[in-house]
Amino acid sequence: NAQYNKNPTILNHVQWFQPSLGWSSGPTALRMACEKGFKHIYILGFDYQGHVVNPNTKAAKLNNIFGDTRNYKKRTDEATFYGNWMNQTKRCLADFKEIKFYRVCPEGAFKPKDLEWNENLGHMNTKEFVELFKLTQRPT
């Protein structure tokens, strides 16, 4: 990216994974939180499948806050297959067994069977998360 050449010293403050993981942004953020030594990590925004628009075919549309922005898919586009994100999440769960992970998602949300093997992952609905941390939730 030519923008990095405008101020090359900015990259002096970047901590690169060694070796490079080549991961997506969400699992990379999860990995960074793991490496900080937290005992409990709450995972938000990992829906894995997007918004299901047809329960019969399980067709799903993009569900991402960056949808319709520059260099990103349209909100009307089909959801991206979540296999890579799933594998990257599973790697974090396996590599950091001492951490308790809580995946926060709406009531009745998709729960991937691929994550159920792990004893250090639990699911929490959004209401429980809001109550646990005494947060104020804006109306949708």
Question: Residue spans of the language-model regions?
Answer:
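Metal-ion/cofactor- or nucleotide/acyl-coenzyme-handling active-site neighborhoods
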Residues: 1-140
